[in-house]
From Swiss-Prot:
Family statement drawn from the similarity comment of this UniProt entry: Belongs to the XPG/RAD2 endonuclease family. FEN1 subfamily.
UniProt-annotated binding residues for Mg(2+) 1: 34, 87, 159, 161
Originating gene: RAD27
Region ranges (Interaction with PCNA): 339-347
Protein source organism: Candida tropicalis (strain ATCC MYA-3404 / T1) (Yeast)
Cell compartments where the protein resides: Nucleus, Nucleolus; Nucleus, Nucleoplasm; Mitochondrion
One GO BP: DNA replication, removal of RNA primer
Annotated EC: 3.1.-.-
One MF term in the entry's GO annotations: 5'-flap endonuclease activity
Region (Disordered): 353-374
One Pfam family here: XPG_N
Protein's recorded name: Flap endonuclease 1
Cofactors named for this entry: Mg(2+)
Length: 374
């Protein structure tokens, strides 16, 4: 689900935290990708001309495999090395959010069924997309495909976003990539959004600097996590009626959720704290997530198993042999070259002197000269 209103809040208070660029600008980078999130995107966006998901002759959905295969190749062609991180078991606190998602899908199914032969094609597609979920089988299919492609995968013990952030903090990759803004709660040096979007959508990649975001918001990591819980996260409900502006104001004024709760319970406001609100437990999940240590993880990109890809994707899933072979050759070529060094890793950026700086230096020099003459 992410954190409601966080993106807008950071843009308002920390505009310097954002960079926008194209895929090619990530040349030479290693990136940890939230696999479940990108599979969900592919199931929604990779469609036939009639809006239906891609399927093979047996009626099996293949949108997720097509998306993973071609987008990964595009990254490798741009000298980017991706690693896909898969979710493990969800935290107990997330059970409520998962139940809500199930209820929303059931409601969408009822609304879709109610349309029957009525309504527009767009109406039917709208409800169909709300029904999308990534199944365990689709996760396993994606893992098998990535292994055949020679792309490393990591199975997180719990949340994939937390594991992506751990890999970035540990220096194994440059950034964590996910659409979920709550990834920032796990302190990745950089968060990439829209990385797995198709280039045809013409949506630039967003890079958010954690350090710059905290500087602009003027918060430490504990306060930032409390802000995200107050805005609304996957682990617990929030205080009804508190939006982004109010949430930010409350954290700045009181400093922590404990003090906000204390202030509310003294009757100083119209807000009501949810009964048995587990905000402290939610905070702990963000500050001390269950992850594999980056130092214990070895990431290796290997040469693709071309014949294995043909067997799995062509014979097993009904893809075009010519396209799979062509894609495999691009992958082979890209991975063989390795990640080339970036120019910014060899040079230190030096601030340029503008006209004013030169003028100031000249004035200072003249003043010093005059003093010496005296």
């Amino acid at each position: 689900m992410g954190v409601k209103g966080l993106n807008k809040l950071i843009k308002e208070h920390s505009p310097n935290a954002y960079k926008e660029y194209q895929l090619k600008n990530l040349f030479g980078r290693k990136v940890a990708i939230d696999a479940s999130m990108c599979l969900y995107q592919f199931l929604i966006s990779v469609r036939q001309s009639d809006g239906q998901q891609l399927t093979n002759d047996d009626g099996e959905t293949t949108s997720h495999l097509s998306g993973i295969f071609y987008r990964t190749i595009k990254m490798v062609e741009n000298n980017i090395k991706p690693v896909y991180v898969f979710d493990g078991k969800p935290p107990v606190l997330k059970g409520g959010e998962l139940e809500k998602r199930l209820l929303r899908r059931e409601e969408a199914q009822k609304q879709k069924d109610a349309l029957k032969d009525e309504g527009t094609v767009e109406d039917h597609l709208k409800f169909e997309k709300r029904l999308v979920r990534v199944s365990r089988e689709q996760n396993e299919e994606a893992k098998k495909l990535l292994e055949l492609m020679g792309i490393p995968i990591v199975e997180a013990p719990c949340e994939a976003e937390a594991q992506c952030a751990e890999l970035a903090r540990g220096g194994k990759v440059y950034a964590a990539a996910s659409e979920d803004m709550d990834t920032l709660c796990y302190e990745p040096p950089q968060l990439l959004r829209h990385l797995t979007f198709a280039e045809a959508r013409k949506i630039p990649i967003d890079e958010i600097s954690y350090k710059e975001a905290m500087a602009g918001l003027d918060m430490n990591k504990e306060q930032f996590v409390d802000l995200c819980i107050l805005l609304g996260c996957d682990y617990c409900e929030t205080i009804r009626g508190v939006g982004p502006v109010t949430a930010y104001k409350l954290i700045k004024e009181h400093g922590s959720l404990e003090k906000i709760v204390e202030w509310i319970e003294k009757g100083n406001t119209k807000y009501t704290v949810p009964e048995n609100w587990p905000y402290a437990e939610a905070r702990e999940l963000f500050l001390n997530p269950e992850v594999k240590k980056a130092s214990d993880i070895s990431l290796k990109w290997k040469e693709p198993d071309v014949e294995g890809l043909i067997e799995y994707m062509v014979k097993g899933k009904g893809f075009s042999e010519d396209r799979i072979r062509s894609g495999a050759e691009k992958l082979k070529k890209g991975l063989k070259g390795g990640v080339q060094g970036r120019l910014d890793s060899f040079f230190t950026v030096v601030k340029k002197d503008d006209g004013k700086d030169k003028k100031r230096k000249s004035t200072a020099k003249d003043t010093k000269s005059k003093k010496q003459k005296k």
